Swiss-Prot record:
<comment type="similarity">
    <text>Belongs to the PlsX family.</text>
</comment>
<dbReference type="GO" id="GO:0005737">
    <property type="term" value="C:cytoplasm"/>
</dbReference>
<dbReference type="GO" id="GO:0008654">
    <property type="term" value="P:phospholipid biosynthetic process"/>
</dbReference>
<keyword id="KW-0594">Phospholipid biosynthesis</keyword>
<comment type="pathway">
    <text>Lipid metabolism; phospholipid metabolism.</text>
</comment>
<dbReference type="GO" id="GO:0006633">
    <property type="term" value="P:fatty acid biosynthetic process"/>
</dbReference>
<keyword id="KW-0444">Lipid biosynthesis</keyword>
<keyword id="KW-0443">Lipid metabolism</keyword>
<dbReference type="Pfam" id="PF02504">
    <property type="entry name" value="FA_synthesis"/>
</dbReference>
<comment type="function">
    <text>Catalyzes the reversible formation of acyl-phosphate (acyl-PO(4)) from acyl-[acyl-carrier-protein] (acyl-ACP). This enzyme utilizes acyl-ACP as fatty acyl donor, but not acyl-CoA.</text>
</comment>
<protein>
    <recommendedName>
        <fullName>Putative phosphate acyltransferase</fullName>
        <ecNumber>2.3.1.274</ecNumber>
    </recommendedName>
</protein>
<dbReference type="GO" id="GO:0043811">
    <property type="term" value="F:phosphate:acyl-[acyl carrier protein] acyltransferase activity"/>
</dbReference>
<dbReference type="InterPro" id="IPR012281">
    <property type="entry name" value="Phospholipid_synth_PlsX-like"/>
</dbReference>
<keyword id="KW-1208">Phospholipid metabolism</keyword>
<dbReference type="InterPro" id="IPR003664">
    <property type="entry name" value="FA_synthesis"/>
</dbReference>
<keyword id="KW-0963">Cytoplasm</keyword>
<comment type="subunit">
    <text>Homodimer. Probably interacts with PlsY.</text>
</comment>
Amino acid sequence: MRVAVDGMGGDHSPSAVVKGCVQALEEFKDIEIYITGPEDILKEAFSKFKYDKERVTFIDAKEVISTNEHPAMAVKKKKDSSLVKALRLVKDNQCEAVISAGSTGAFLTGCTLIVGRIKGVERPALAPVMPGKNGPFMIIDAGANVDSKPSYLVQFAKMGEVYFKSVMDVNNPKVGLVNIGEEEEKGNDLTKATYKLLKEERDINFIGNVEPREVSTGDVDVLVCDGFVGNTVLKMYEGVASTILSMIKSEVKSSFLAKLGVPFLAPALMNLKKKMDYKEYGGAPFLGVKGICVKAHGSSDAKAFKNAIRQARKFHENDLIGKLSEEITKKSFDNQKNI
């Protein structure tokens, strides 16, 4: 499998990106890395490690898209940027996947404009998988579409369902609609209309509305919402998780007795920290485009990049894009028959 990596994306590029690539090459013997960015800088970063040189290709790119640039304008103007060149590798079928920790807006825009949407997809969606009390869950959309229509959200539900079936091996994923109350009549015009449509979908296991306080239980596999709500839920969830871990650390240091208990609690605390660590999940897939596109966290370190590559590899092994295309095409055909 060939993976395109934006070598200059993220807060800690290129060092963290390169180190993550080296770790991935060591762990996964069936991958090749195509890394984009200033060739001299990238080669210098790689020279600090031992790696299989036959499995790394450097794609020279002189420009970098920053987070404060207008996404669409930057993608269209900076054709020699590390991000655009990485996306082009997927567009031209030179790579099966692309990973970037750079500007989220530019990445999502570039995926849509360059890689292109799967036929029948109205809007691609950002779909991070998060740790929950009883298992992982997906938030879709987590920021790609701030303004949405009911038909978009129904398609998000279908894409999330396909993901859980093919990647997570869940036979009948439970789909919920994020709302301010469980009752059908609760919410705004968007959620009310979406509820009715999802209720009519016979091939989606729709369980109804899900209140934000129930999001983290993991009892629902796919949480559907517009990008504004999804991004808010995602960032609040990350913030609360970080705060809880910090509070536990402070309490442990607060007294002598608490410190005495650390050896007994350490395994459980380490396990909790691992479950809540975004680095373990690598990145969020951008579902609905023709290639495997993974958005890594902006502050990703080497471990996060390695896991983003692991994630992309798993998507490829499970033919996620092929299954999404098949389901969307089937759904579009069924809709035409019913017109």
